[in-house]
Design a protein with these regions (language model features):
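Phosphate-coordinating loops and pocket residues in cytosolic domains that bind phosphorylated ligands
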Residues: 34, 39, 75-78
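A short acidic/small-residue loop/turn micro-motif
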Residues: 138-141
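Alpha-helical hydrophobic helix detector
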Residues: 20-36
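Aliphatic-rich helix starts adjacent to a transmembrane/signal segment
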Residues: 36-53
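N-terminal leader/signal peptides at the extreme start of proteins
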Residues: 1-14
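Extracellular/periplasmic head regions of type IV pilus-like filament subunits
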Residues: 58-131, 135, 147-170
């Protein structure tokens, strides 16, 4: 009896060259898609931050209606208007929030990105509800009302809550 020699060609599977081609194609697709994905993640974090600043502005109006002045993030949190993560500097969605200024007639809440890879801009909101952004990483607090308003880029200012009543001018 003659035995047939089994040929490697009859075995099922992929050759090494076929696998290398598939890996190369996947690598090319990943190299093209990764930067876009990272930009979408940054945009998502920025959008979440803008929405948080809008909510904080509305909470400031609620606080000032009862206290006749604006509050710090810590005071808003103690008043039950804000999640503790915003007030304790823990960071939310890659941004750290602080309120360097809160008086009877003005406030400023800032959202500073934790790293350069978190987002492309830092944000702040002041008593009139205008949310502004600063492109350069802010090493120190952003001065009151400094930055480009989102409305200059097609965004909107925060509707709704009005600022605290202004004291009478003498």
């Amino acid at each position: 009896m003659k035995r047939k020699k089994s040929s490697r060609r009859s075995q099922a599977g992929f050759s090494l060259i076929e696998l290398l081609i598939v890996v190369a194609i996947i690598g090319i697709l990943a190299a093209v898609a990764a930067p876009r994905l990272l930009n979408y993640l940054k945009l998502g974090r920025e959008t979440a931050t803008i929405n948080s600043l809008r909510t904080i502005h509305q909470n400031e109006a609620t606080f000032s209606a009862t206290r006749a002045r604006f509050g710090t993030l810590k005071e808003l949190q103690e008043f039950g208007l804000l999640d503790p993560n915003y007030a304790n500097g823990a960071g939310v969605s890659g941004f750290v929030y602080n309120s360097p200024e809160a008086t009877a007639d003005k406030y400023c809440v800032q959202a500073t990105r934790q790293t350069e890879t978190t987002a492309n801009r830092d944000f702040n909101v002041i008593e009139d509800g205008t949310i502004r952004y600063v492109e350069a990483k802010s090493p120190a607090p952003i001065p009151h009302g400094e930055g480009t308003p989102l409305s200059d880029t097609g965004g909107t200012t925060t509707p709704g809550a009005a600022p605290a009543a202004q004291p009478p001018k003498s």
